[in-house]
């Protein structure tokens, strides 16, 4: 690996670990650019969206984008090496501040080192301590000066532990329009206007697509056998995943499938129903007011470990935020092609449920719409001023 260039006079260190963190960080960067001097540089680990905001990533973000206990073990040496190099670079010339974006298992270690060096630390995105690993809050107290929360119930949890926290809303609620433009999205993607459309989102990680992709393709084939006029749209998160998806598509040549590069928001906006992997995309689907079926698969050993952790009864963000099941979840052994096809077609035909979800998700959207970029950036600026960094 080439060594990063010499550090600029004023910089803010940041580290994001996957596509959702890249999006969150890019929006926060917009807010920071509007408030901080132009000579402040932003560098560390990030993705393409952060790069569009002038961020310099010295390590490839995709190296950190690994899900599951077993999968992490396979990449652990490389991940630890990247973290060690990042800390060395930051400690050699401490930045004005460090912002860890999600990726808590990676970032908390870096954040603790930064705080010990006197660097103000903000962590963006509360870990799901309300779902599992509540004991992690002690680590968070050591790691951060302030935590930015995406959901309204989270700051109270941190207040009880004496950790400064601010509800910033969810940036996706600012980005996604309250009223989806279905016809406009279909036109942009070249999809037929007069047919039912199912968007299929297998995830943004290679390991997710590898495990879940074949099942989703088999489910699409079953749905098309029942509803021959269905159209499917599948956004590929990156070029590497596009190759894997194209290979799976070749095994189902008769599918009425449009594979698009990126454009996941347009795909969701264009859809009547969404079949998707658990993750941030489930919240995006809710913000587009769509019926959905949530699914997920991890390797067997990872699943056994997860079962012992005491999770909430649901994994999808629409259900977590609702405090109950409002959309179906089919996970692990329940995620068969037959079950996924059956449940997706049921969602497609249940017009009363679709109307309920439109209203329910509209209220959720209004709650989460808080102008995150401005609120989050102001927290960072206030912390910097309070510590004499500006």
UniProtKB/Swiss-Prot annotation:
Principal EC category: transferase
Gene3D superfamilies named in the record: Glycogen Phosphorylase B
Keywords tagged on the record: Glycosyltransferase, Lipid A biosynthesis, Lipid biosynthesis, Lipid metabolism, Transferase
Swiss-Prot/TrEMBL catalytic activity: a lipid X + a UDP-2-N,3-O-bis[(3R)-3-hydroxyacyl]-alpha-D-glucosamine = a lipid A disaccharide + UDP + H(+)
Recorded metabolic or biological pathway in which this protein acts: Bacterial outer membrane biogenesis; LPS lipid A biosynthesis
Pfam families: LpxB
GO molecular function terms noted in the UniProt entry: lipid-A-disaccharide synthase activity; phospholipid binding
Enzyme Commission designation: 2.4.1.182
Disulfide bonds: none
GO cellular component terms listed in the entry, alphabetical order: membrane
BP GO terms, sorted: lipid A biosynthetic process
Role according to the record: Condensation of UDP-2,3-diacylglucosamine and 2,3-diacylglucosamine-1-phosphate to form lipid A disaccharide, a precursor of lipid A, a phosphorylated glycolipid that anchors the lipopolysaccharide to the outer membrane of the cell.
Family: Belongs to the LpxB family.
Annotated protein name in UniProt: Lipid-A-disaccharide synthase
Gene, per the UniProt record: lpxB
């Amino acid at each position: 690996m080439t060594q990063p260039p010499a550090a600029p006079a004023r910089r803010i260190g940041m580290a994001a670990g996957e596509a959702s963190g890249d999006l969150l960080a890019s929006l926060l960067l917009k807010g920071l650019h509007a408030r901080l001097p132009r000579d402040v540089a932003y560098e560390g680990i990030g993705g393409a969206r952060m790069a569009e905001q002038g961020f310099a990533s010295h390590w490839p973000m995709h190296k950190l984008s690994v899900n599951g206990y077993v999968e992490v073990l396979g990449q652990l040496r490389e991940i630890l090496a990247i973290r060690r190099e990042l800390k060395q670079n930051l400690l050699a010339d401490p930045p004005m501040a460090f912002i860890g974006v999600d990726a808590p298992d990676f970032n908390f270690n870096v954040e603790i080192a930064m705080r010990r060096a006197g660097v103000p630390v903000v962590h963006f995105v509360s870990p799901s301590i309300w779902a599992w690993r509540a004991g992690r809050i002690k680590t968070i107290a050591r790691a951060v000066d302030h935590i930015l929360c995406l959901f309204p119930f989270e700051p109270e949890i941190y207040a009880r532990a004496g950790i400064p926290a601010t509800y910033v809303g969810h940036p996706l609620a600012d980005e996604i329009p309250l009223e989806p433009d279905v016809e406009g999205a279909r036109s942009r993607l070249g999809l037929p206007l007069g047919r039912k459309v199912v968007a299929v989102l297998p995830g943004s990680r290679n390991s997710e697509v590898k495990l879940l992709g074949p099942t989703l393709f088999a489910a699409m084939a079953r749905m098309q056998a029942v509803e021959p006029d269905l159209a499917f749209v599948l956004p590929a998160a990156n070029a590497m995943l596009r190759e894997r998806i194209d290979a799976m598509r070749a095994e189902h040549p008769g599918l009425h499938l449009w594979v698009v590069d990126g454009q996941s928001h347009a795909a969701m906006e264009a859809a009547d129903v969404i079949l998707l992997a658990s993750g941030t995309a489930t919240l995006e689907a809710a913000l587009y007011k769509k019926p959905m079926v949530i699914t997920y698969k991890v390797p067997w050993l990872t699943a056994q470990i997860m079962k012992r952790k005491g999770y909430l009864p649901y994994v999808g963000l629409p259900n977590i935020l609702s405090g109950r099941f409002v959309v179906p979840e089919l996970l692990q052994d329940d995620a068969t092609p037959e079950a996924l096809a059956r449940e997706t077609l049921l969602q497609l035909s249940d017009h009363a449920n679709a109307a309920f979800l439109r209203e329910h998700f509209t209220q959720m959207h209004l709650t989460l719409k808080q102008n995150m970029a401005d609120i989050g950036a102001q927290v960072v600026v206030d912390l910097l001023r309070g510590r004499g960094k500006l």
